Amino acid sequence: MSTFEKINKVSVVIPVYNEEESLPQLLERTIKSCKQLEQEYELILVDDGSSDNSAKMLEEAANIEDNHVIAIILNRNYGQHSAIMAGFNQADGDLVITLDADLQNPPEEIPRLVATAEEGYDVVGTRRRNRQDSWFRKTASKMINAMITKATGRSMGDYGCMLRAYRRHIIDAMLQCHERSTFIPILANTFARRTIEIEVAHAEREYGDSKYSFLKLINLMYDLLTCLTTAPLRLLSVVGSVIAVAGFLLAVLLIVLRLIFGAIWAADGVFTLFAILFMFIGAQFVAMGLLGEYIGRIYNDVRARPRYFIQKVVGVKKPNKNQEED
């Protein structure tokens, strides 16, 4: 077993986006849970450009003395994982725990994650027990998990559950990565030597709706596909070769059939020509779209713009970094 530094402080990072209804209960339950820890703790809540009163409520919570709350206000919405990275940049705990603000994963699980990490793990993942989501979200999640496992070779049952714990050296390694599109559980596993996944409770969403719509889930799948591997580019070569061979064989078959049955059978070749043409055009558009995804990500990385811009930090205990360092 690897030798780990003792956990003296725990940081809990929570991205917040339009969660004003759940925030009072979230703060109360998370603070109560953290008070059970033997270690020092801090709560870092990152407002990801909310349009409701979430940012104001976070600032008020951070201004309460001895509340151990730090509020980070981003100037606009950058997405869940960018908001979490902003929280990582502020956190100074030996163990950093991420938690969603919707209370579907109970904050009461935090002490168990800390205890598990103390057993000598770099990353403590979680798997939702009796998941309270729609059939569509469960199915999409299974597809994404299978795709991630295939691409990374790391088998974990629930990459979509953000209730996770990361050792300090994993956080430091992730902060050195500056790609624009980041999926934190996968990024962490690329640096982790020892990982474990434990079951945690999962509740129905009590307030509001999920922030991941159908279109956002589709975008997430594209992000994961193009961030994880270049296998789709290699697949294009295989598909192109198969289409070329199939086209050649079909052409030979049509010539033979025309010689046997005559021009009337082939309808002068018009419909056959259209069928082959549409097949090739469809394959080309798919290939162009996929190549465009990769080129677009290269373009975004080359521009080297920050993942996020911090408008304000309230309750800060370390020097304010107004934006991520590149």
From Swiss-Prot:
Enzyme Commission number(s): 2.4.2.53
Residue ranges of the TM segments: 236-256, 270-290
Matching InterPro entries: ArnC_tfrase, Glyco_trans_2-like, Glycosyltransferase_2, Nucleotide-diphossugar_trans
Molecular-function annotations in GO: phosphotransferase activity, for other substituted phosphate groups; undecaprenyl-phosphate 4-deoxy-4-formamido-L-arabinose transferase activity
SUPFAM superfamilies, A to Z: Nucleotide-diphospho-sugar transferases
Protein's membrane topology: Multi-pass membrane protein
Sorted UniProt keywords: Antibiotic resistance, Cell inner membrane, Cell membrane, Glycosyltransferase, Lipid A biosynthesis, Lipid biosynthesis, Lipid metabolism, Lipopolysaccharide biosynthesis, Membrane, Transferase, Transmembrane, Transmembrane helix
GO biological process: 4-amino-4-deoxy-alpha-L-arabinopyranosyl undecaprenyl phosphate biosynthetic process; lipid A biosynthetic process; lipopolysaccharide biosynthetic process; response to antibiotic
Catalytic function, reaction form: UDP-4-deoxy-4-formamido-beta-L-arabinose + di-trans,octa-cis-undecaprenyl phosphate = 4-deoxy-4-formamido-alpha-L-arabinopyranosyl di-trans,octa-cis-undecaprenyl phosphate + UDP
PANTHER family hit by this protein: UNDECAPRENYL-PHOSPHATE 4-DEOXY-4-FORMAMIDO-L-ARABINOSE TRANSFERASE, UNDECAPRENYL-PHOSPHATE 4-DEOXY-4-FORMAMIDO-L-ARABINOSE TRANSFERASE-RELATED
Similarity comment text for this entry: Belongs to the glycosyltransferase 2 family.
Role this protein plays: Catalyzes the transfer of 4-deoxy-4-formamido-L-arabinose from UDP to undecaprenyl phosphate. The modified arabinose is attached to lipid A and is required for resistance to polymyxin and cationic antimicrobial peptides.
Protein name: Undecaprenyl-phosphate 4-deoxy-4-formamido-L-arabinose transferase
Gene: arnC
